[in-house]
Each structure stands twice: as structure tokens, then as C-alpha cells.
Amino acid sequence: STAVWLVDAPDLRAQAESGSPGRGGGRGGSPRPRELAAWLQIAADGTVTAFTGKVEVGQNIRTSLTQAIAEELPTPLSSIKLVMADTRLVPLDGGTVGSRTTPDMNLQLRKVAATAREALLDLAAMHWSVERATLTAADGRIRHPASGRTIGFGELTKGEKLVVNVSDRIALKPASQWTIAGTSVPKVDGHT
């Protein structure tokens, strides 16, 4: 079980931590931040905001990256807002070059979403004082089937950031079990 802390984050500014292990963008550059909140926030209403330095220029990465997050978290596509290329907010990740977004950023955001999922399961187990293994996550909610209890991701976090590091060793959903990623969905619109 991972220690998970909730901290009020009214003005989150994603930025790389100096001295962190890893590389940005897959081709050198600054290290990627390890803190989950640099990549993903869950608002009290359940809206998931994810951050990437990648730029949508017609290659439809907004949709594919949103699908990757929805698959691993798991939450509806409609609840995800992807902030792209806002240098005030997003982690430094080496830019949109060399056809690296899908192999690099898709994998990174899957790890981010899976780490968030595991942290939410840990929080719910503590919240309800139940065994973590008895919980499931689906559709933006944690469920305890034995008692019928359910709680939304936003209700659980109350809009506070999850303070946990993204794990490179996190278990990711195998492609054979995907129901969102890799499927045909309407293009995700970047305008709000």
C-alpha cells in the first residue's frame, strides 16, 4: 500500500523537480516531474485535468491521449480536460517532435492515470476502513461491492491534489482488455 496525502492546491503550477530521475521527451532534456499532481488533478466535481507539453496540430493526439487516461484511471472521456502546451502549467516534456507523442506521452499518461487509480483505491480503503482488494474502480467512481457503497473520484479527493509519485513500475491494463483506448470515438474537442 502506498502512502497517499491530500493537499490543498488552488494554484497548481506543474514544473519539473530538479534532480529527478528520468529524461524528458524521450530524447534528452530536463527530467520529467515525478509528482502525480504535475500531470493530473481531480476536481471536487470529478473533472480530471491532465497536463502535457505536447501540441495538437491535426494529428488527433488530444483524443488518443485522453483515451489513454480514461482507460487507466478509469473515468468517462467526457470528464477529462487535457491542458496542452501551456508553458505556465504543463510539465517540460521535450516538445512535439519526431513522432514521439504516441510512444512516449501516451505511455507516460497511462502511468500517471494508473498511479492515480491506485492512490484513489488506497484512499477509499482508508475512508471506508475496508480491505483495498475488495474495491473496484470504474466510470469515475470507487465501489465496494460487498456493502454497495460507492464514491466518486472528486468526492474522495474533495478537489485536493494527490501527493504521490508516478510509478514507472505501475501495473498497466493490457491492450487485450482495453475498452476505450484504441477504439473509434468522436474527436475530443479542445475548446471549452
Show which residues each predicted segment covers.
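Cofactor-binding beta-sheet edge motifs in enzyme active sites
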Residues: 1-8, 12-192
